[in-house]
A protein has these predicted regions:
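C-terminal terminal-structure detector
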Residues: 47, 137, 186-251
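Residue-level signature of catalytic and energy-coupling elements of molecular machines
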Residues: 15, 73, 101, 160, ...
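A hydrophobic, helix-centered structural microdomain
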Residues: 49-119, 234-251
Length: 251
């Protein structure tokens, strides 16, 4: 092929390469890219420009810095209350799956008793979600202080550190646990083609009423396929509104 293209180039003839024989989805966007030493045709459901990605990262850094300041203040206030009710570490860390399947540690202010992970297996029969997520309205593992910091999303504040580190973005999809990810089908894994977010479409779309995992996946895929910086800004404003006015779905 290279020799043929060069011969046509020498004669001043434009060359077109037919890729329809590969039967690739016509809805995918196509672009020419250089990957290492190779020229390639790239296919993607939604191509995002480098400038837009840099704008998103800049927004993450700015938001992460402000968020860490808020986190420090929150820790000073609620930290002693968490420790008084349930002795143990103030912060909770857990392995989650991020962009392209990369494992990272997510951080939260501890809202459960220390044996929460062990007790989860006992409570799986009471899972209110249909699919690969776990959720209980009256989870007995949550402390009294934990209920408050979950309702106000204070427990999520340490994740601003994950945003600054680059593990997460301010807006994105929910990062699954390792055991959830191991049960994913190929379609579910599309949720991980972007960085997971501190907030996202599901969180601002009545998460207390959405119990079907497949519906959540559809919402996430739609977000990825139609992503824009302006959509992120809209989700951030809606998130702030829900935090200030209260979100009954925060469990």
């Amino acid at each position: 092929v290279a020799m043929t293209v060069q011969n046509f180039e020498d004669m001043g003839i434009k060359t077109n390469l037919n890729i329809s024989q590969f039967q690739i989805n016509e809805n995918l966007e196509r672009s020419l890219e250089k990957v290492g030493p190779y020229e390639s045709v790239s296919f993607s459901g939604h191509n995002v420009s480098f400038v837009m990605l840099m704008m998103k990262r800049a927004m993450d850094i700015a938001g992460g810095l402000v968020g860490m300041l808020i986190t420090a203040i929150a820790v000073i206030i609620v930290g002693p209350l968490v420790k008084l009710e349930s002795p143990g570490p103030l912060f909770f860390s857990q392995k989650r799956v991020g962009k392209n399947g990369r494992i990272f540690k997510i951080y939260k202010i501890r809202s459960m008793y220390q044996d929460a992970e062990e007790r989860k297996k006992e409570l799986m029969a009471q899972n209110e979600m249909d699919g690969l997520m776990f959720k209980m309205k009256d989870d007995p593992r949550i402390t009294k202080v934990g209920k408050f910091i979950r309702k106000t999303s204070i427990d999520e504040l340490p994740q601003f550190w994950n945003v600054l580190k680059g593990d997460m973005s301010l807006v994105g999809t929910r990062p699954p646990t390792v055991d959830e990810f191991e049960q994913y089908s190929a379609y579910h894994k599309k949720r991980l083609c972007q960085k997971p977010g501190l907030t996202g479409v599901w969180q601002v779309s009545g998460r207390s009423t959405i119990t079907d995992f497949e519906e959540i996946v559809q919402m996430d895929v739609d977000y990825i396929d139609h992503w824009s910086i302006w959509r992120d800004i809209g989700i951030l404003f809606k998130t702030v509104w829900l935090v200030v006015c209260g979100d009954d779905g925060a469990q």
